[in-house]
């Protein structure tokens, strides 16, 4: 007899209802809960799956390179990056009429194409790619890499090649190899690529597989390196009149500290970036030799943590017991990794626009908007995931005896203070921010705009001034000619930095006023509310006054009922579910702010943002409504244009989003009644009743219905705003 899905759970496979299918899907990746799973097997399966993950990433990137090389216009774009629109790939659609064919035939293409808003053209150009052949070579290399990784994944599932549990638990060796190898050597390799390939290409000298071993990246060769005269590599940098990709105005330096941006490309100097990666490589390769392994020298993580005890005694036993707690809990490790990755992803969003690393990207406004929005949303989802796995750790892996008296136990012991403080902060921020906005709305509605409460962000302006922004007239640190900070850096990076920070042609330290002050606090409200829900969910995951035995019910449970009132909606999963709504809310406000501020600056109309952002109607009318008008009228009986696909996606996104509410508002009983009625009708309908099923139809649990609702809400939300950002920006700037 064929075994039924799911093979990993005998109990579910024997369930006579459709629960078998839905719970099977829901627990497919919860490896810990699978039949016969041992700790060693769990680690081995996860380890092997990493190779598959990397293979998928390589395959995807290979596909990007291949399609641009085959159907794109990379070489034409390289001739004139500011005026040629980069093509992502061709479109073949049997539904296209002649108007659509004409509308989507752009960028010098022969037929309909999609425009690239991902920044890959700028990235590939910056790192030294110039021809479609370069792209094909990269695609082929990644394809081979993906095949090798798939083989490695298969290999590590074979008994002879499965690492042992002790290998996975060897934290010091892993740290050394990841720090020195993963971060250090890869940064060194990237420095090598920048110095040997990207910098010469930026100066009009081609370097390829045919000549990279014979082309010196610097006229002096390696002599200055060996005789300690390293400053030679920083002499004669590219001049301010350098034309990127040509020898006009080019220098010979390879490792510099110029500061600021290349005047033509408005991106960071390639030689500065090479220097940065070299420094990172040195630091991480050193760090990768710090931990004690076979040779009995270096740090022991366990000893460091055991020794971490506050002299005052106010932190109890400090970090005692944390080494084993972290090292034996995959959820703890995943939580830490996701929290770090979430922060880094948000920093990427921030730095990608304020310090653009890729040539000509800063002048491609739609790409800048898309990349900021994309990375902030990704960061939001990753950060909520960090707290989800933190909560699962507390339920499944936390050992109260092993952690008695240490900082982790003390976190749990004073959780009421943490949660109530977060609650106080959110109430304060919410009432005051909304109060200011609403007051200003009322003043405008009553015809007295001069009675608005407008607060200058003086502290933030002071911080900007201390970094060298002269506009506000604060005479402090880098904005003061007499400051030691100014004189110390005068001969190296400071002139380039000061030029950049005081220039109106980039997004470095934008001028801020009362509108920024208000939206900053609105975003702070969103961040603190999201944090409150997530922190409360994790700290109450093991139990609360209302439900002291909560941990016995697992991570996600609908209720302990009937008969035990108030236990619905308090699982740690429910906290995650609620937090995602607030996270989306917050990222929405953040991206609205970024996008509107930049639209105003790019259009040379900063006053629009400054005047309209101080009251809510301004946001609704002058940002959302004004910029969605093209989308709302994107296609009609009289015709369509190249924005019509975004107009349709805008509509479709709203529909997906609205579908979410159907699952969020109606609960299990409604669906059970509906399903039973539909099953009755199906069995009595000719032809339809030829299709039978053995499983008794059972509605999803409340938790699963909430998941379906949340998924639709999130996907619809993201689709709607993606279409809005791309269409409203590309509609104005091309």
Swiss-Prot record:
It is a multi-pass membrane protein. PROSITE patterns: PHOTOSYSTEM_I_PSAAB. The keyword Cell wall biogenesis/degradation does not apply. Keywords: 4Fe-4S, Chlorophyll, Chloroplast, Chromophore, Electron transport, Iron, Iron-sulfur, Magnesium, Membrane, Metal-binding, Oxidoreductase, Photosynthesis, Photosystem I, Plastid, Thylakoid, Transmembrane, Transmembrane helix, Transport. P700 is a chlorophyll a/chlorophyll a' dimer, A0 is one or more chlorophyll a, A1 is one or both phylloquinones and FX is a shared 4Fe-4S iron-sulfur center. Chlorophyll a B3 binds at residues 662, 670. It comes from the Eukaryota. It catalyses: reduced [plastocyanin] + hnu + oxidized [2Fe-2S]-[ferredoxin] = oxidized [plastocyanin] + reduced [2Fe-2S]-[ferredoxin]. GO terms for biological process: photosynthesis. GO terms for cellular component: chloroplast thylakoid membrane; photosystem I. [4Fe-4S] cluster binds at residues 559, 568. One of its GO terms (molecular function) is oxidoreductase activity. InterPro entries: PSI_PsaA/B, PSI_PsaA/B_CS, PSI_PsaA/B_sf, PSI_PsaB. It holds the Pfam family PsaA_PsaB. Its EC number is 1.97.1.12. The keyword Oxidoreductase applies. Phylloquinone binds at residue 671. The chain crosses the membrane at residues 46-69, 135-158, 175-199, 273-291, 330-353, 369-395, 417-439, 517-535, 575-596, 643-665, 707-727. Belongs to the PsaA/PsaB family. PsaA and PsaB bind P700, the primary electron donor of photosystem I (PSI), as well as the electron acceptors A0, A1 and FX. PSI is a plastocyanin/cytochrome c6-ferredoxin oxidoreductase, converting photonic excitation into a charge separation, which transfers an electron from the donor P700 chlorophyll pair to the spectroscopically characterized acceptors A0, A1, FX, FA and FB in turn. Oxidized P700 is reduced on the lumenal side of the thylakoid membrane by plastocyanin or cytochrome c6. The PsaA/B heterodimer binds the P700 chlorophyll special pair and subsequent electron acceptors. PSI consists of a core antenna complex that captures photons, and an electron transfer chain that converts photonic excitation into a charge separation. The eukaryotic PSI reaction center is composed of at least 11 subunits. NCBIfam families: psaB (TIGR01336). This is Photosystem I P700 chlorophyll a apoprotein A2.
């Amino acid at each position: 007899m064929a075994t039924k899905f799911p093979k990993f759970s005998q109990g579910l496979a024997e369930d006579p209802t459709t629960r078998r299918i839905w719970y099977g899907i829901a627990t497919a990746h919860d490896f810990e809960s699978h039949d016969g799973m041992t700790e060693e097997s769990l680690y081995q399966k996860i380890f092997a799956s990493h190779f598959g993950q990397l293979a998928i990433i390589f395959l995807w990137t290979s596909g990007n390179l291949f399609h641009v090389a085959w159907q794109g216009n990379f070489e034409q774009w390289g001739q004139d990056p500011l005026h040629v629109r980069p093509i992502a790939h061709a479109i073949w659609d049997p539904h296209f009429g002649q108007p659509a064919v004409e509308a989507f035939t752009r960028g010098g293409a022969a037929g309909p194409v999609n425009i690239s808003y991902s920044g890959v053209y700028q990235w590939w150009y910056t790192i030294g790619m110039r021809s479609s052949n370069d792209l094909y070579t990269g695609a082929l290399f990644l394809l081979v890499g993906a095949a090798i990784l798939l083989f490695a994944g298969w290999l590590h599932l074979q008994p002879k090649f499965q690492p042992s549990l002790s290998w996975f638990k060897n934290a010091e060796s892993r740290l050394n190899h990841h720090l020195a190898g993963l971060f250090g050597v890869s940064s060194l390799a990237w420095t090598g690529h920048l110095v040997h390939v990207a910098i010469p290409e930026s100066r009009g000298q081609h370097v390829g597989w045919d000549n990279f071993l014979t082309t010196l990246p610097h006229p002096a060769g390696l002599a200055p390196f060996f005789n300690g005269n390293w400053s030679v590599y920083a002499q004669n940098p590219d001049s301010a009149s350098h034309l990127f990709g040509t020898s006009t105005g080019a220098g010979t330096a390879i490792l510099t500290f110029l500061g600021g941006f290349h005047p033509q490309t408005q991106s960071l100097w390639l030689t500065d970036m090479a220097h940065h990666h070299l420094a990172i490589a040195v630091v991480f390769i050193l760090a990768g030799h710090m931990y004690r392994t076979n040779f009995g020298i270096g740090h022991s993580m366990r000893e460091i943590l055991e020794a971490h005890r506050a002299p005052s005694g106010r932190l109890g036993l400090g970090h005692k017991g944390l080494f084993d707690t972290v090292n034996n809990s995959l959820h703890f490790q995943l939580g830490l990794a996701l929290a770090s990755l979430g922060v880094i992803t948000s920093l990427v969003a921030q730095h990608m626009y304020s310090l653009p690393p890729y040539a000509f990207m800063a002048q491609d406004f739609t790409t800048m908007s898309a990349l900021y929005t994309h990375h902030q949303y990704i960061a939001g989802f990753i950060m909520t995931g960090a707290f989800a796995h933190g909560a699962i750790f507390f339920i499944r892996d936390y050992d109260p005896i092993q952690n008695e008296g240490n900082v982790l136990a003390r976190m749990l012991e004073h959780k009421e203070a943490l949660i109530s403080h977060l609650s106080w902060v959110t109430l304060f921020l919410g009432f005051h921010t909304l109060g200011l906005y609403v007051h200003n709305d009322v003043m405008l509605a009553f015809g007295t705009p001069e009675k608005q409460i407008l607060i200058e962000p003086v502290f933030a302006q002071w911080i900007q001034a201390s970094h060298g922004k002269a506009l506000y007239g604060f005479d402090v640190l880098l904005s003061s000619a007499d400051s030691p900070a100014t004189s110390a850096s005068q001969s190296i990076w400071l002139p380039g930095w000061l030029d950049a920070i005081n220039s109106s042609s980039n997004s470095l330290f934008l001028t801020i006023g009362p509108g920024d002050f208000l939206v900053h606090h609105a975003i702070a409200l969103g961040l603190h509310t999201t944090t409150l829900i997530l922190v409360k969910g994790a700290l109450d995951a093991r139990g609360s006054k209302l439900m002291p035995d909560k941990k016995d019910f697992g991570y996600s449970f609908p209720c302990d009922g009937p008969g035990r009132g108030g236990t619905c909606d308090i699982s740690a999963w429910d906290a995650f579910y609620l937090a995602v709504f607030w996270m989306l809310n917050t990222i929405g406000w953040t991206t609205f702010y970024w996008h509107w501020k930049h639209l105003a600056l790019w259009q040379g109309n900063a006053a629009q943002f400054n005047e309209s952002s101080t009251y809510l109607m301004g946001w609704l009318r002058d940002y959302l409504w004004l910029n969605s008008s093209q989308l709302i009228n994107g296609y009609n009986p009289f015709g369509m244009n190249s924005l019509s696909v975004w107009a349709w996606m805008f509509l479709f996104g709203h529909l997906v989003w609205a579908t979410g509410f159907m699952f969020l508002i109606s609960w299990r009983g409604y669906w059970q009644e509906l399903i039973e009625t539909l099953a009755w009708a199906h069995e009595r309908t000719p032809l339809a009743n030829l299709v039978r099923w053995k499983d008794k139809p059972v509605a999803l649990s409340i938790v699963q219905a909430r998941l379906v609702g949340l998924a639709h809400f999130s996907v619809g939300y993201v689709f709607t705003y993606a279409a809005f950002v791309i269409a409203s920006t590309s509609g104005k700037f091309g």
